[in-house]
Swiss-Prot record:
Expressed by the venom gland. One of its GO terms (biological process) is defense response to bacterium. Keywords: Antibiotic, Antimicrobial, Disulfide bond, Secreted, Signal, Toxin. It comes from Lycosa singoriensis (Wolf spider). This is U15-lycotoxin-Ls1d. InterPro entries: Elafin-like_sf. Has antibacterial activity.
Length: 86
């Protein structure tokens, strides 16, 4: 009986980790001079190692997702270019 309860609890813990929502991390920067804005990415495919393309006031950067909401994913699109955008 105890082993069944343990197995169920272990399964629930595993599912909560796998099914938890992921977000771009919130940026600690609130503003950026236009001459310093650059995009390292425009879409998630531009990033490596499971990181996402996240938007910040200083441009788009590859960041690892977190379980805390607050950041935003880069919109990408045809107008997005990598490098300095000024």
């Amino acid at each position: 009986m105890n082993s069944k309860i343990f197995a169920v609890l272990l399964l629930l813990a595993f599912l909560s980790c796998v099914l938890s929502d992921q977000y771009c991390p919130k940026s600690s920067i609130t503003a950026c001079k236009k001459m310093n804005i650059r995009n390292d990415c425009c879409k998630d495919d531009d990033c490596t190692g499971g990181s996402w393309c996240c938007a910040t006031p200083c441009g788009n950067f590859c960041k690892y997702p977190t379980d805390r909401p607050g950041g935003k994913r880069a919109a990408g699109g045809k107008s997005c270019k990598t490098g300095y955008v000024y």
